[in-house]
């Protein structure tokens, strides 16, 4: 696959640890943070299937509120969790698409691949 020369800003919005209201992600505060980030001219958001609740949070705070072409969204395959077959990896990708509601990802990364797991992805 060829590099397409995608341009992204120098600062990305990571969604690993979001503000919480008790045990659940505070969506209203996350929306405010997303708005401040976008208003400052930044557009790259980074989430992951393994960041509990973050894909649903980005759907509510970004995807449902901004035109899809106005931001770049990356998520990750949690290679260390339940991805020993092509079917498991595809299932995790499909789950991420559904949870974010984004329609597509600008970037899809293999998260924490590690030497002991890379052969699974070489196989498929």
Predicted regions mapped to residue ranges:
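N-terminal binding-site loop/beta-alpha segment at the start of enzyme catalytic domains
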Residues: 1-71, 103
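Active-site mouth loops of central-metabolism enzymes
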Residues: 16-28, 76-90, 116-120
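Glycine/proline-rich, positively charged
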Residues: 35, 83-124
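A sequence-level detector of short, solvent-exposed, charge-rich linear segments
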Residues: 49, 56-57, 77, 115, ...
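Generic beta-strand or strand-like secondary-structure segments
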Residues: 57-60, 76, 88-95
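Short alpha-helix boundary/capping motifs
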Residues: 65-66, 74-75, 124
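A short, structured active-site edge motif that brings together acidic residues
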Residues: 69-82, 108-111
